[in-house]
Amino acid sequence: MLRATARVDISSSDGLVELGRDQIDLAIRGGRQPQDRVVARRLDDNRFLLAASPQYLAQHGRPRTLADLLQHKALLYRGPHALIRWQGRDEEGWRELAVPPAFISNDGASLIAMACQHRGLVLLPEWGLRPYLQRGELEALELEQPVSVNR
């Protein structure tokens, strides 16, 4: 429970912060373990899933391979410094996938909303997609080869 004298100031950003220096007491981040001098606790798995609405899949087909993805529309995330590109791993290793974007945003909720409106495929952390998968608004896609994002 929050004390009546406590002040909460929330900043939602993908930018990295320096705890203390930036007057930040608590940060929630996704990705790699931070420096040793930071106390970190794992909140959830950060595994990325490829997903789409059942209606999108009925209209455009279900991709099975990396090559199939190129015939679909991507809903891409823009990080603080660059577009977060999709990558696939084949027998030659990891390579960037040139899936044509239909929508680009730096807001995961906007990407999920577009996926739920049948606009394309989204590749986001499972924890963000979980409620939509559980309600059947989105379906997780398993390809023959692994897909992830460049970070």
Model-derived regions: residue spans:
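Central regulatory/effector-binding core of bacterial HTH transcription factors
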Residues: 1-39
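C-terminal regulatory
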Residues: 17-21, 33-151
